[in-house]
């Protein structure tokens, strides 16, 4: 009976490992030495290692650093699934576009203190300096558009109204 428990647990662990490998798309990296991985591949491998622990809270420092646009979308999908499972994700990032597109709440630290904390939308709309390129370019016409997607939607809506 005791060995049956271990066999079942081993199968569960293997299944979880396969799921994490697939989610983080690191299957082709498993036989490589960590020093041979690119920065983005190292980020994905590190995320996979952490996800195997099934954390309730994820503390991430610059998780998009070194990632291409395709994998940033994949990372956002992973974060969304984790949030649905009740995982809290706290990340520090200078990737304004990623934070604007996928963040729930954004805060700014200055001199060791949080000086503001708002919904991602309110944070980037109300900020002249720390905002997205899309918001800077379109704010005169569409002040509430923060992401490229929102600017495109606002343009399309405006065009239909003409």
Give each language-model segment a name.
Residues 33-37, 41:
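Conserved ABC ATPase signature
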């Amino acid at each position: 009976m005791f060995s049956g428990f271990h066999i079942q647990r081993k199968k569960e662990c293997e299944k979880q490992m396969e799921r994490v490998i697939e989610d983080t798309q690191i299957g082709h990296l498993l036989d490589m030495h960590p020093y041979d991985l690119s920065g983005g591949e190292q980020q994905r491998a590190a995320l996979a290692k952490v996800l195997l622990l099934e954390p309730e809270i994820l503390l991430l420092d610059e998780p998009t650093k070194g990632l291409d646009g395709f994998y940033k979308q994949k990372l956002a999908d992973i974060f969304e699934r984790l949030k649905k499972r009740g995982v809290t994700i706290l990340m520090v990032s200078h990737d304004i576009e990623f934070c604007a597109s996928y963040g729930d709440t954004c805060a700014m630290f200055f001199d060791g203190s949080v000086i503001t904390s708002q919904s991602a939308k309110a944070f980037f709309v109300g900020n002249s300096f720390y905002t997205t390129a899309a918001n800077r370019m379109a704010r005169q016409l569409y002040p509430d558009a923060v992401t490229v997607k929102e600017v495109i939607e606002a343009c399309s809506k405006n065009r239909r109204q003409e």
